[in-house]
Amino acid sequence: MNEQGLSEKEIFSYLEDVKSEDTDYYRVLSSMCTHPHRIAVEAHRLFIEANLGDLGLFAGAHRLEKEVIRMLGELLHAQSVEIPSGEACESSVCGYLTTGGTESNIQAIRGMKNLVTEDGKKSGEILNIVVPESAHFSFDKVANMMGIEVKRASLDPEFRVDIASAESLIDANTIGLVGIAGNTEFGQVDPIEELSKLALENELFLHVDAAFGGFVIPFLEKPYSFDFKVPGVTSIAIDPHKMGLSTIPSGALLFRSPFFMDSLKVNTPYLTTKSQFTLTGTRSGASAAATYAVMKYLGREGYRKNVQYCMQLTTKLVKEARKFGFEPLIEPVMNVVDLRVPNPDIVREQLLKKFGWNVSITRNPRSLRLVLMPHNTARDIEEFLQDLRKVTTEL
């Protein structure tokens, strides 16, 4: 650290230089994040100092968090929604704002583990959860952090979890199941209703990772059952900083009832509240303000238009790609497309090296993974496909 302070001009000159190293979203077809809405940015700045880790000091930011959770609960068909106020939830469905899907997934599984061990069930055993092979890598972190075995169920031909496979993995030490509503690689929605039946029959918890799909599925033309309408669902992860167009970090975790939320409680004797239910202590009140602002500003109609736009791009990409002989692995469920191309790893490398396109690769099978986000345009799609054709022709 320098002894004497630098001038603002020097600092911001350096910051501008460094920022130029970041990739402009214009050439990004791999990220599930995008530019936050301008109103979210403005609201974020207004509450930049607010710390939701000390609710008594930042009652206004806390009020916004409660309102965001209420709106998310309505979106996910919760009957009534509240976040903890002090020691307990004030009504049936509880939740709080997280840093994103990883934290939400960790906390959901932590809650499962706490509940079964507090009740004296399965104590001393190596507990396990059953997740799809398509589950996010955050569940590997769960295994490492909590000493829980993560069993991976195989996928069906449409890349949804195979229910028979999931059922075969359940044993006496299984504490919960996980379903994905908009998985990262394929954009597919697992059969949550069937997982719910399996969970209820075996007295297991069921967590739904809708980090990406939570702001997409409710606005698709085709309906999917994935949320609290499904009786066995006990918790849901949803990320406003993805298709919700909020600022980073803005995630959320919702529980069906205080029973699940209470399992996360720790005492905080030196703060303005007696307890916390969160993983992190300090939390961004600015993210709560940003999410509140953009959800109120756009409303359901605005989000519906946002999803329609992305799905129009998705349809265009698939239609035009087929003209060049590139078929999708599956017909896209949402704004994620996986294209069958020869030597996808080499194609990905050449697309970046020669044309600056950022795309990614699915693991099994290997294919070119593309995410169509609000920052993309029809012109982007046309340019990308021309460049893709050039790269594959040269192989």
Curated annotation (Swiss-Prot):
Pathway: Cofactor biosynthesis; methanofuran biosynthesis; Cofactor biosynthesis; coenzyme A biosynthesis. This is Probable L-tyrosine/L-aspartate decarboxylase. Pfam families: Pyridoxal_deC. Disulfide bonds: none annotated. Gene3D superfamilies: Aspartate Aminotransferase, domain 1, Type I PLP-dependent aspartate aminotransferase-like (Major domain). Belongs to the group II decarboxylase family. MfnA subfamily. Catalyzes the decarboxylation of L-tyrosine to produce tyramine for methanofuran biosynthesis. Can also catalyze the decarboxylation of L-aspartate to produce beta-alanine for coenzyme A (CoA) biosynthesis. Keywords: Decarboxylase, Lyase, Pyridoxal phosphate. GO terms for biological process: carboxylic acid metabolic process; coenzyme A biosynthetic process; methanofuran biosynthetic process. It catalyses: L-tyrosine + H(+) = tyramine + CO2; L-aspartate + H(+) = beta-alanine + CO2. It is an enzyme of class 4 (lyase). Its EC number is 4.1.1.11, 4.1.1.25. GO terms for molecular function: aspartate 1-decarboxylase activity; pyridoxal phosphate binding; tyrosine decarboxylase activity. The modification N6-(pyridoxal phosphate)lysine is found at residue 242. It comes from Methanosarcina barkeri (strain Fusaro / DSM 804). Its cofactor is pyridoxal 5'-phosphate.
